[in-house]
Amino acid sequence: GNVGNSLALQVAEDPHAVYVIELSSFQLDNMYDFKADIAILLNITPDHLDRYNYEMQNYVDAKFRILQNQTVEDAFIFWNDDPIIAREIAKRHPEATLYPFAETHEAGVKGYTEDKKIRIETSNGTFTMEQDLLALSGTHNLYNSLASGIASKLVDIHDENLRASLSDFTGVEHRLEKVARVRGVDYINDSKATNVNSCWYALQSMTTPLVLILGGTDKGNDYSEIEELVKKKVHALIFLGVDNTKLHAFFDGKVPVIEDARSM
């Protein structure tokens, strides 16, 4: 996926009992014998539609290949409130044992928040932790913590190790990565946010006025998803795309300042 390290190289050089792999839809398209002991789908939103003939279902089918070959002995962890995932589960009836997570407690949910704590319930026991001790902020990182917490309990990670990891994890490069502060302005690199939904979560986590750089290659994006957050939080937009026509068509007149740029 986006991590960039070869799984085959990791296995060849330094074998471990457990491997955590990020798999892109591009990789899943060509995987047939692979089976995940624990598969995780955080959400599904439009992305890479230029690769999938601008048909959302084709992209969804690719993402759900992560469940191929799973049995009841395997686990499928997913966000319970994602409408596309819910629809596909009802249609596909996965063989894997289901471990949904949600922000609030619902019937059957294995990870949720309650009384300002995260709570994870599996056959290996119950784990709780104060929500304000999580190292990473934002709703998306709460979901990430719940999903990774369920997976950790399923492989029997000790509670003290899980708690330590969730409280001191520093994040990864290019994902809301704080690069520098210059004259009171924070510069944040979120270049891994390659779709509109990722941008929504980034904007949702911000608490100060923003200058937002948008660009790249349009992949069938629907910018209405971030329209209200842009109006509310963004002071200036800088377009850094191959073709900014669609960006201008949607955002012109909606923020005080809009500029085009050719490079960082």
Predicted regions and their residues:
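Short beta-strand segments
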Residues: 22, 43, 79, 213-214
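Short beta-strand-centered segment that lines the nucleotide-binding/catalytic pocket of NTP-utilizing
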Residues: 1-6
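Inter-motif core of Ras-like GTPase G domains
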Residues: 33-43, 203, 207-212
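Switch II (G3) loop of P-loop NTPases
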Residues: 18-26, 186-192
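Acidic, Mg2+-coordinating active-site environments of NTP-dependent enzymes
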Residues: 8-16, 37-187, 248, 256-260
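ATP-dependent carboxylate-amine ligase
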Residues: 153-158, 164, 168-172, 178-186, ...
